[in-house]
Amino acid sequence: MKIIDASNTVYGRLSAYVAKQLLNGEEVVIVNASKAVITGDRKFIIDKFKQRLDIGSVRKGPYYPKTPENILRRSIGDMLPKKITRGKEALSRCKVYRNLPKNVSSEKIEKVDDVMTDKVVGIITLEELSKELGGM
């Protein structure tokens, strides 16, 4: 089982990395999902996510999440082949937590160097995005 800290990691890169690990049969736990970042213009990102929310309605989808852990989980799921059993089972092996839960030991947590933000000017965390969407 891999425990990955999502603090200061790029949202899309982390999702792609985790999706690959899940398809290889690993169990993955992601902690601190609210501290993952999306790079780009803040206003553009917020408008893009709000536009997605406006597409669906209460009775008819698509349904887009508003909380940080569900936003990250949805992006991982979008990178998996959901129509076949292999993809569904892979997504079931993924657990995403907003913060560090008590049942996860902090000694085994690893940071993935390939997906870290270095010197990026425009970023927004999933927590800030969630507040803008009304999820927190």
Swiss-Prot record:
Please report any disulfide bonds recorded for this protein chain, giving both cysteine positions.
none
Q: Which GO terms describe its biological process?
A: negative regulation of translation; translation
Q: Which GO terms describe its cellular component?
A: cytosolic large ribosomal subunit
Extract the InterPro entries matched here: Ribosomal_uL13 (IPR005822), Ribosomal_uL13_bac-type (IPR005823), Ribosomal_uL13_euk/arc (IPR005755), Ribosomal_uL13_sf (IPR036899)
A Pfam family per the record: Ribosomal_L13
Domain of life, per lineage: Archaea
Molecular function, one GO term: mRNA binding
Q: Which UniProt keywords apply?
A: Ribonucleoprotein, Ribosomal protein
Regarding protein family, the annotation reads: Belongs to the universal ribosomal protein uL13 family.
Function in brief: This protein is one of the early assembly proteins of the 50S ribosomal subunit, although it is not seen to bind rRNA by itself. It is important during the early stages of 50S assembly.
Which PANTHER family does the entry mention?
A: LARGE RIBOSOMAL SUBUNIT PROTEIN UL13, RIBOSOMAL PROTEIN L13
Q: Spell out the NCBIfam families in the cross-references.
A: L13_A_E, PRK06394.1
* Subunit annotation: Part of the 50S ribosomal subunit.
Listed name of the protein: Large ribosomal subunit protein uL13
Natural source organism: Thermoplasma volcanium (strain ATCC 51530 / DSM 4299 / JCM 9571 / NBRC 15438 / GSS1)
